[in-house]
């Protein structure tokens, strides 16, 4: 690794617009392309402080600073365009969380890297709307929060209540939301409002280890812990009335439900298994990287293809997982209001993935190319008229769901043409951590965090209260800064702001 004084490091980073910073070749060894990151004045300070701290004598161990991780990704074989850091970027395993990179599938040296997807494969967000308003929910806010908490299994060791045997799991891994539809857990239209229509077709359950399947079998239909949550939210602001109306959001005060979860222990095991195989492939094919956490394999190698097929199965697991929780959420609301989910208009606005690698067609140097786009802590954001988004959103662009930290606002954005050119149709995914989990536990008291939420009028139900400080707003960047930066640089556009009134956490 290159070790330089902080002032020397800064020579490789150039501010090219009010919210954009170029990372020049040479910042890290063997960079094939430049890097770029997006940050406003507040977010920029965090990026540079992290870099400055890493330059101090004796500062070793842990993850590299985000800006170094962006540059190391820029050195991977077959990368095209730039290695992109979104405004919510923070250090992660291999790739930073909030790092997007695309690889030319026609180039035989191009790679796929599990570190570019993350351990929680297809961690993502689903947003449901209702025809209820805050005035309808406020009188029963606590009861509704409890009903949701009772219906959805949450917490570290939570087990699902959706009936599932080994054969069902195999089918769910291959079919994704088509399995949920067949079993009666979703409405037919839910699939239309889901990235990839809730099913990655290249999934192959035979490429998944028995250990992963054993971990995943009891966990379908569970929220898990960490930063995962189910929130009852209120529409607080509408920035784009036309886009909001296409999503079924007409007025302020309307009630929505956001479900944030992923592939649980199943996806984690798929990633762990793949990293072992990738290290062998790297030795055989003499692939060198700047960081051993960037373990990878040629896309068209056996290991590369096996990972992509197993990753797709994990993505399908996550869509079935969120679909099962959608079913349970609809039941909880119907029970509380003594009606049906249909009568409550509990439609899915959209479902997006934040951790995935996908084959997509993009323009590179004026020509269409098939790319493998790695999005880790990054959301696909397709523009109006794109063939991969449903008819309902052809005029608005794809809805992009951005969850805030616990107790803070969330946003719905829309994809833009500029984003297609600048970031291969990618934008931020959330607030992004500013404190590590360990520092959060040391610096914050969970009782204070719970009191603050109650003071804001938020009903809170938590399976593991002592883990709450890890997810406190003080542990994260301000999601408003993140979203505004994306809006200002034009890679996505603000449509709706949502405020939580009830939070269910593991």
Curated annotation (Swiss-Prot):
SUPFAM superfamilies: Hypothetical protein PH1602. The keyword Manganese applies. Mn(2+) 1 binds at residues 120, 123, 228. Ligation probably proceeds through 3 nucleotidyl transfer steps, with 2',3'-cyclic phosphate termini being hydrolyzed to 3'-P termini in a step that precedes 3'-P activation with GMP. In the first nucleotidyl transfer step, RTCB reacts with GTP to form a covalent RTCB-histidine-GMP intermediate with release of PPi; in the second step, the GMP moiety is transferred to the RNA 3'-P; in the third step, the 5'-OH from the opposite RNA strand attacks the activated 3'-P to form a 3',5'-phosphodiester bond and release GMP. HAMAP family: RtcB_euk. Catalytic subunit of the tRNA-splicing ligase complex that acts by directly joining spliced tRNA halves to mature-sized tRNAs by incorporating the precursor-derived splice junction phosphate into the mature tRNA as a canonical 3',5'-phosphodiester. May act as an RNA ligase with broad substrate specificity, and may function toward other RNAs. This is RNA-splicing ligase RtcB homolog. It comes from Aedes aegypti.
């Amino acid at each position: 690794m290159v070790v330089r004084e902080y002032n020397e490091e800064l020579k490789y980073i150039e501010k090219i617009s009010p919210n954009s910073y170029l990372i020049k070749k040479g910042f890290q060894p063997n960079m094939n392309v430049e890097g770029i990151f997006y940050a406003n004045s507040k977010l920029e300070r965090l990026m540079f402080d992290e870099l400055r701290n890493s330059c101090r004598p004796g500062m070793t161990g842990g993850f590299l600073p985000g800006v170094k991780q962006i540059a190391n990704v820029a050195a991977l074989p077959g990368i095209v365009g730039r290695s992109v850091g979104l405004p919510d970027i923070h250090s992660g395993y291999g790739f930073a969380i909030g790092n997007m990179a695309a690889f030319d599938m026609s180039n035989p040296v191009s790679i796929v890297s599990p570190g570019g997807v993350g351990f929680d494969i297809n961690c993502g967000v689903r947003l449901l709307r209702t025809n209820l308003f805050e005035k309808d929910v406020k009188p029963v806010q606590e009861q509704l929060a409890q009903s949701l908490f009772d219906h959805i299994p949450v917490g570290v060791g939570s087990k699902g209540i959706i009936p599932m045997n080994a054969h069902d799991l195999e089918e769910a891994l291959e079919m994704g939301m088509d399995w949920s539809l067949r079993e009666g857990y979703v409405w037919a239209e839910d699939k239309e409002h889901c990235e990839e229509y809730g099913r990655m077709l290249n999934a192959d359950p035979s490429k998944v280890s028995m250990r992963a399947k054993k971990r995943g079998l009891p966990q379908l239909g569970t929220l898990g812990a960490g930063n995962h949550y189910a929130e009852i939210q209120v529409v607080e602001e509408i920035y784009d009335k036309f886009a909001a109306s296409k999503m079924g959001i007409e007025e302020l005060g309307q009630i929505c439900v956001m479900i944030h979860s992923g592939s649980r222990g199943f996806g984690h095991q798929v990633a762990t298994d793949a990293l072992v195989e990738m290290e062998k492939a790297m030795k055989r094919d003499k692939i060198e990287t700047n960081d051993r956490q960037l373990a990878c394999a040629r896309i068209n190698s056996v290991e590369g293809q096996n990972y992509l097929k197993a990753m797709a199965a994990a993505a399908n697991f996550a869509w079935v997982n969120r679909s099962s929780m959608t079913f349970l959420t609809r039941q909880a609301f119907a029970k509380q209001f003594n009606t049906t989910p249909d009568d409550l208009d509990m439609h899915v606005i959209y479902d997006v993935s934040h951790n995935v690698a996908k084959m997509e067609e993009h323009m590179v140097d004026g020509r269409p190319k098939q790319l493998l786009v790695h999005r880790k802590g990054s959301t696909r954001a397709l523009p109006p008229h794109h063939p991969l988004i449903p008819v309902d959103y052809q005029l608005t662009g794809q809805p992009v769901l951005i969850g805030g930290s616990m107790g803070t606002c969330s946003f719905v954005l829309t994809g833009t043409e500029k984003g297609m050119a600048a970031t291969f149709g990618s934008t931020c995914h959330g607030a992004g951590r500013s404190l590590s989990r360990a520092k959060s536990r040391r610096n914050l008291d969970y009782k204070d965090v719970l009191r603050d939420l109650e003071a804001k009028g938020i009903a809170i139900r938590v399976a593991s209260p002592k883990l709450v400080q890890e997810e406190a707003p003080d542990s994260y960047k301000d999601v408003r800064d993140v979203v505004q930066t994306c809006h200002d640089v034009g890679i996505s556009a603000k449509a709706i702001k949502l405020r939580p009134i009830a939070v269910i956490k593991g």
